[in-house]
Regions:
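A structural motif specific to WD40 beta-propellers
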Residues: 12-14
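Surface-exposed receptor/substrate recognition regions of extracellular proteins
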Residues: 1-9
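Surface-exposed molecular-recognition determinants
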Residues: 7, 16-168
Length: 168
């Protein structure tokens, strides 16, 4: 039988074997200026911030492969955008945010969903027909991939042991 223990922040054991933490969610309140969001126990490489205050702030998705000045707003149909005041750094125990209302409005409540890939270390991957830049955590089945498309049918290496089940 499989025994699972939940410590309120992350799954801690499966079959009584300790597993590393590759994902964690932390709630925080915006201050409208700058602040560090800590307590993850790892450097997040993919951060998804969502306001829970019932407002119209965008979801902010940022990763350490593309860098802090590139975000995707997943509740919008637009392309990736630049904004230096959302996630401003990926830190050893969390991340920091600037003054943008989508990620840090004064008194607004947020959830930060964070995944650990490879600590910001990328490698070139030529497994597909397009060479990609990959930051993979094969143990977690998670990777961040960056490539330049050619507008034709191409394949892209992802650094995982099996085909991805979700693409964002």
């Amino acid at each position: 039988s499989c025994e699972e223990y939940y410590n309120g922040a992350a799954w801690k054991k499966i079959n009584n074997v300790a597993i590393p933490f590759y994902f964690k969610t932390i709630a925080f309140t915006g201050n409208g200026a700058t602040q560090s969001i800590t307590g993850f126990g790892f450097q997040p490489d993919f951060v998804w911030i969502k306001s829970t205050s019932g407002n119209t702030y965008s979801h902010v998705l940022t990763d350490s492969t593309r860098g802090t000045n590139s975000q995707i707003y997943s509740n919008d149909s637009g392309a990736a955008t630049s904004n230096a005041n959302n996630v401003t750094s990926f830190d050893s125990d969390g991340f920091s945010v600037g003054s943008n209302t989508n990620s840090n409005a004064s008194a607004a409540n947020y959830l930060a969903y964070c995944w650990k890939a490879n600590g910001g270390t990328t490698s070139s991957n030529s497994d597909g027909s397009i060479t990609s830049t990959v930051q993979a955590n094969t143990a977690a089945g998670f990777s961040i991939v960056k490539w330049i498309g050619t507008q034709v049918n191409d394949s892209i290496g992802h650094g995982l042991n099996s085909a991805p089940e979700l693409l964002i």
